């Protein structure tokens, strides 16, 4: 059972989502509906995009805690560009470029300068947050054009253009990681860095690409944030890094690298957003969200560690049992061969 849970974290996350839907459907029959599902998906889009980027980084056995600051910086970038008179496409492309450069810089710090990822991204967290506040003077950005808000307006099956883009990105990344040699390089890099290098994997390029794509996903999340609420507060992106990591771990992405899937991370993001909707349903204050997220992350990490130890212990016991069984069989064969007439004659001749 433990091995099944360890190997099917996506199924476990999906079961948790369906169970929560069923329980809340019993409490409020209106909750169990397509409208509720699309509403949660719309609310989860920012976290889904961040989870996609965080998955790539965590698969390589790294972590990026600066994504919240990159999200805020890129939201400010697109807002300032739009208010300066640039078109929507140019403003969004500029924000994506800023996100990619920020992620690339993180990758350079980790791969070329050999700074531990947690230390490097803690530094850039403050750097990007400070740059965001310098650009805005600590003020909010308001008066964003309607074109930006249209990106989050439902168009087909109550899903916005950004929502459809997010689903395409999920499918593309799932295919990339599961069906290409380039995608499997992420797993190899995170599982055994030196072994991957000996196999010819360009591990530095893989890690830099992972951080760069993480920056792009954070930039896209910043664009979604600005389009959904129509203005940009000076604290945009605060705390999102913890939620992104929690979503990935909840969906089966290992902090030790080399394990997990995009689908699992997306299910984890959806489950966390669903928990937030429960808090709204129960009319609990908004500041409970961070507490619940931290509690879920801590609980999943403890459970994951205990589960991994239990599975490894079970595997060791099975190996020991097989070894013992082979030893017993070997002893029996030796005893039988010693009791044969030919063996008896050899013993007499020796005497």
UniProtKB/Swiss-Prot annotation:
Coiled coil: none annotated. The chain crosses the membrane at residues 14-34, 39-59, 70-90, 93-113, 115-135, 155-175, 213-233, 252-272, 284-304. It is found in: Cell inner membrane. It comes from the Bacteria. CDD domains: TM_PBP1_transp_AraH_like. One of its GO terms (cellular component) is plasma membrane. It is a multi-pass membrane protein. One of its GO terms (molecular function) is transmembrane transporter activity. It holds the Pfam family BPD_transp_2. The keyword Nuclease does not apply. Keywords: Cell inner membrane, Cell membrane, Membrane, Transmembrane, Transmembrane helix, Transport. The keyword Secreted does not apply. Part of the ABC transporter complex LsrABCD involved in autoinducer 2 (AI-2) import. Probably responsible for the translocation of the substrate across the membrane. PANTHER family: ABC TRANSPORTER PERMEASE PROTEIN YPHD-RELATED-RELATED, AUTOINDUCER 2 IMPORT SYSTEM PERMEASE PROTEIN LSRC. NCBIfam families: PRK15432.1. Belongs to the binding-protein-dependent transport system permease family. AraH/RbsC subfamily. The complex is composed of two ATP-binding proteins (LsrA), two transmembrane proteins (LsrC and LsrD) and a solute-binding protein (LsrB). This is Autoinducer 2 import system permease protein LsrC. It comes from Yersinia pseudotuberculosis serotype O:1b (strain IP 31758). The gene is lsrC.
